[in-house]
Amino acid sequence: AIDNFNNIIWVKPYLSEPYFFRGLAKLNLDDYEGAIQDYSKAIELNPNYFHAYMYRGVAWHNLRKYEEAMADYAQAIALEPRDAYVYANRGITEAEMGDFKAAEKDYSKALMIDSKLVAAYLNRAVVREKLDDWEGAMADCTSAIRLNMFSDDAFGLRGYLWFQHKEYHNAIEDFNRALKANPENKRILMSRAMVWYEMKKYPEV
């Protein structure tokens, strides 16, 4: 794919789109610095390129350059304030920075725009748990499960929340459902073993 975009750029270097899509290809290959260069060129050619700002923010985030990511998300929101994904992405960066209240607010904005974003429910559940809003976190997990009954992440996170409140039987039930969706999930296998241990059901470990 990168070679194809190289050829297009060689012939039509004045177009912003080939730089943007080559940036996406580099982002998928974990070449974050290369992606940033291409997104920056796309923005130079088209200063109102919303998606270039948003994905450059993602690349900055992956390089742990959170201030740069936040600046790009802010610019993207100024250009397109009704896009759910840019709020969800900014929430991820805010959570990494430890600003859980801001992250919760952005996940909520994303879900107001698009109420079917499973990842936003799960990410909001994580920050709500950190903000000691156990009931809110549980509600978000349940909303995610309603949208995707085969989400091992949703069942696994809800199982963890049950475990935190010593609701061991409910935790086991959710971990079992998570493992039914993905039997190879080692993290959930270990979590279930911890619950069995707490319940003194040692043979199950």
Where would I find each of the regions flagged by the language model?
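Alpha-helical tetratricopeptide repeat
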Residues: A1-V205
